[in-house]
Regions:
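Conserved pre-ATP/AMP-binding loop-to-beta segment of ANL
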Residues: 4-8, 19-24, 127-145, 152, ...
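Conserved AMP-binding/adenylate-forming
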Residues: 34, 49-89, 390
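Conserved AMP-binding A3 loop
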Residues: 35-39, 141-168
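AMP-binding/adenylate-forming catalytic core of the ANL superfamily
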Residues: 60, 106, 335, 340-341, ...
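Conserved AMP-binding/adenylation subdomain of ANL enzymes
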Residues: 164-181, 189-225, 240-241
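Gly/Ser/Thr-rich phosphate-binding loop
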Residues: 225-229, 238-298, 310
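Conserved beta-loop-beta connector loops within the AMP-binding
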Residues: 310-332, 351, 369-370, 431-433, ...
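AMP-binding/adenylate-forming core of the ANL superfamily
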Residues: 323-339, 358, 364-366
């Protein structure tokens, strides 16, 4: 979209002049029983902007409420960076986020029983029609805290330019337009729920429905055209065929934030007639890969680079790996959506890039000759080096999930004096461990079979449904 047009404005749909001219949507945002028209959004968010314009940064307790929507929109209209804080975060982690970010106030809601920062409430019925100048595209929009494997969460600094670019790139790939109704029940403090779901809707101008929690029945009742969910939610959707079939009128079903198991992909496609769209990204890069609305959707693969994105695979020594659909390498990307760095951590920022400016994703992947990407998993836990072979945990997990006695599966590598690492699988289900070992050996190369299978009641996951594999290693 051309600079200087309305698209140069980050939240392009919140245009006071257009609303004053009669361009309005009565249900632009719906959260539970609450509804905000576009006129409500513009007037109330601009009123918020007037109250926070002098701040350097504000923290927003990211509950799925109209107050949160108006707080985030108002701060961005004023050009004030937003620090979204999970409502269920522990006191120590919250204190780190506030101290590290330099947030000067809670905007909107604040945690109960805390007086760590001044509080600026959001007035739902206040209105202002002042037109703020659009901040520079390089100005910071968001500081999103992402948990690493060691140390406290790091603040990922995202510019307005990066956020706008990613939404526009996805709009092209997904044929996302103002005619869509986007539905999700995801947290508003991560890329998936906040940047894509909420800010994407406020930029594109489509209707946005947040279901409060990602309950399948709520998804079915929303009657959207574009749905966002994590694999855990899609797994629950396919467990209720009536709910799944209610989504058959949707245009796109998008899965992300973790790998979508192939059996869930297949069942969702069967019940809805819609093979789901998978995409890949990170807080540091936003979304960089996706299958397309008009392209192939292949189970287990996350698609092609979005417009403007370049990817490559390298080995342990930094040499290029073949894009042959089989060779596993370390995934690196270059993208216009790249973050501006980790807040207050220049050394960690420098370490995230190689000498040529490629961002090290930390993920192992395979790239096919057609450019399609398959994510094997995190280098640290999903790339297993066993007996001289490099084995992707995801490939084994896919096979295990194809066994009728397995509901969930996670594969890790653990230190082994003979093999370097031995493959261990954790499964939820009623299959016998020895039968699963033989099942994998029959489907894949023998060296990819688990040396041990443990049947457990559940697998550890975070709020976004991602497996916490380092916890599994600790179980051994």
């Amino acid at each position: 979209m051309a600079a200087g047009s309305v698209a140069a404005v980050l939240l392009a749909s919140l245009n006071p002049a257009a609303v004053a001219g009669g361009v309005d949507i009565g249900d632009a945002v719906r959260i539970g029983d609450a509804t905000l028209s576009r006129s409500d959004l513009v007037g109330a968010a601009t009123s918020v902007a007037e109250r926070v314009a002098a701040a350097d940064r504000v923290a927003v307790l990211a509950t799925p409420t109209p107050v949160t929507v108006l707080a985030i929109a108002g701060a961005l209209i004023a050009g004030v960076p937003v620090v979204p804080v999970p409502a269920d975060v522990g006191a120590a982690e919250r204190a780190h986020m506030l101290d590290d970010s330099g947030a000067q106030a809670w905007l909107g809601e604040k945690p109960q029983g805390t007086d760590d920062l001044p509080h600026i409430p959001v007035r739902l019925h206040a209105r202002s029609w002042h037109r703020y100048p659009e901040p520079h595209p390089d100005a910071t929009a968001l500081i999103i805290y992402t948990s690493g494997t060691t140390g406290p969460p790091k603040g990922v600094v995202l510019s307005r330019r990066a956020v706008a670019a990613d939404i526009d790139m996805l709009a092209e790939a997904w044929q996302w337009t103002p005619d869509d109704t986007l539905v999700h029940g995801l947290p508003l403090y991560h890329v998936h729920g906040l940047v894509l779901g909420l800010l994407g809707s406020l930029r594109i101008g489509n209707r946005f429905v947040h279901t409060g929690k990602p309950k399948p029945a709520e998804y079915a009742a929303a009657r959207g055209s574009l749905y966002f969910a994590v694999p855990t939610v899609w797994s629950r959707v396919v467990e209720d065929p009536d709910v799944a079939r209610a989504l058959s009128s949707a245009r796109l079903l998008v899965s992300g934030s973790a790998a979508l198991p192939v059996p869930v992909f297949d069942k969702l496609a069967e019940l809805t007639g819609q093979p789901p769209v998978e995409r890949y990204g990170a807080s540091e890069t936003l979304i960089t890969l996706s299958t397309r609305a008009d392209g192939e959707r292949r189970p287990g693969w996350v698609g092609l680079p979005l417009q403007g994105v370049a990817t490559r695979l390298v080995d342990d020594d930094g040499a290029p790996c073949a894009h042959d659909g089989e060779t596993v390498g370390r995934l690196q990307v270059q993208t216009p959506t790249i973050f501006d760095g980790y807040l207050n951590l220049p050394e960690a920022t420098a370490e995230a890039f190689d000498a040529e400016g490629w961002y090290r994703t930390g993920d192992a992947a395979v790239i096919g000759g057609d450019g399609m990407h398959r994510i094997v998993g995190r280098e640290s836990v999903d790339l297993i080096k066993t007996g001289g072979y490099r084995v992707g945990a995801g490939e084994i997990e896919t096979v295990l999930l194809g066994h009728p006695g397995v509901a969930e599966a996670a594969v890790v590598g653990v230190p082994d004096d003979d093999l370097g690492q031995r493959i261990v699988a954790f499964v939820v289900g009623d299959a016998e461990p020895e039968a699963l070992i033989n099942f994998v050996a029959e489907q894949l190369s023998v060296h990819k079979r688990p040396r041990e299978v443990r049947v457990v009641n559940s697998l550890p996951r975070n709020a976004m449904g991602k497996l916490l594999k380092k916890e599994l290693v600790g179980w051994l």
